Amino acid sequence: MSAQKSSLWTTHTFLFLGFVVLLSYLTYFHHYWEPQAVFWDENYHIASAQKYLNGVYFMEQHPPLGKLLIAAGEKILHPNARADQYIGTDYATNFPPDFSFKGYRFFSAFLGWWTASLLFLIFLLITRNPLLSSFLSFFYIFDNALIVHIRGAMLEGPLEFFCTAMILVFLLLLEHRERQRLFLLWSTLLGVVFACIMTTKILGLVFILLIPAVLWKLLPDGRTIGRFFVCFLLGFLAVYIAVWHIHFALGKRVVPTLPDNGYYQASPASKQLLATGRTGSFLAFPILLRDAFGFIAHYNRGTPRLDLCKPDENGSPFFDWPIGARAINYRWETPDGNTYRYLYLQSNPVVWLTTFAAVILAICLLVGSFLAPPRQPLTHRFLLMVFTGLYASFFVAVSRISRVLYLYHYFIPLLVGFVIASLVLMEVKKLGRWNLTEYGKTFGLIVLAALIFVSFQFYRPLTYYEALTDAQFARRAILPVWELTSVHGTRTNALAVAKNCGN
């Protein structure tokens, strides 16, 4: 086994990794500042970033790390002469013609780019084959929905990076659990990346389920379990507290035009801390954190529910997400009145449908392994159980959320689905009457990678804001459930019609 592990890091491995880095640069990072126009939640996140840059106190529905990174990109690159136009509002509008998005979008696009290399390493640990790993990376590199969203000043770029990092560290921890120093390192890093997830978006809480999976592998060694918990908690608390402390320490200035005269429903104790300039004190930390959690709960209670009867509803039911429904038109414009540029959250159907099929096949493999154990047992049954359980648990969790959710909320299970697809590839030994050799799997994966690339190119205009005629747009609306609608069309959701909205 050790020889097999050492043979992973060959010249071929680094060449294929370089190939993945280059391709993902071209899809995620190249000219990420285009279009030079705001879309979707950038109005909110740029306003939040400017508050950090100007020391303005505020609270928001999401934890602070993603928005701190958006602000850091603008601080580092500094492409704009001003960074204070929107400190008096939570929703930035009327962007000047020369406004540059290069700084605000930097970290989302940058981390989105490097997520591909982390996925390559995950696939390498599973397949032990750099060629297979590079083509499996096509699932991420050429997915149109991930690309268009992550290239914006959004939270999903950092979130996907941290989630991918946690999966990678989880696999490395399991692989090196017999080597004490590496085990302690990966245990600490697991806490660090989980803290990064939880300070970016609370939706990433589902990754807490990787901890019981680690404990299961460590049983019955109570001493090792104790060391794991100590390292994990140290890593988690150090980052979690540091991120929130930076958020509180930066917010010293109250701007009265913001909600609740700039206090965002802060408690009297927090108002006193603001008045005396003590928000950076660690003694103030519990008070400010309590208020921040209270505001998150308050904000989500006020968020509307999904209403498919609304003609402008962009949300979608969670059970539609695996097949790419519903697409979202982020923005559009027409250069000449005959063609139209769209920025659309539209899936690569080959990626999403293949991933969903892999999840279904994984469930079948697991059920079959228990009900009718095959002569050759599953090689990766534990990992299949972990990641299929993670995928299913996400949907159980979101099914209990009453507020409206959107297609990009599926990005976390989609990422997990990519890992499941790699595990299924390694487990499937026969296809009908044919035995699947390693060469057969490689050939099949190359064909699939080619289909992914062709599909990516087909939907490329909707990803990179390229002009289309109405006829060209209509040819891309393959599945009605996507509701891929041109500027001249009307969204008619089949579920809403069935509910008889009274239109």
Sequence positions of predicted segments:
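Transmembrane-helix motifs of polytopic, lipid-linked glycan transferases
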Residues: L17-G18, N94, D98, K102-R128, ...
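Transmembrane-helix signature of polytopic, membrane-embedded enzymes
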Residues: F19, R82-Y91, F95, W114-F142, ...
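Short helix- or helix-capping micro-motifs
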Residues: V20-S24, L136-I141, V148, L168, ...
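Aromatic-rich transmembrane-lumenal/periplasmic boundary elements in polytopic membrane proteins
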Residues: P35-L68, A72-K75, Y240-D320, A467-W482
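Short acidic/glycine- and proline-prone juxtamembrane loop motifs at membrane-interface regions
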Residues: F39-W40, A145-L159, T200-L203
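Interfacial juxtamembrane loops and adjacent helix segments
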Residues: F58-A109, L308-G315, D320-P322, A327-Y344, ...
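Membrane-interface transmembrane helices that cradle and orient dolichyl/undecaprenyl
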Residues: I126-T127, M166-S187, W216-L219
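Transmembrane helical bundles and short interhelical boundary loops of multi-pass, membrane-embedded
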Residues: R181, I225-F232, F236-D260, Y264-A266, ...
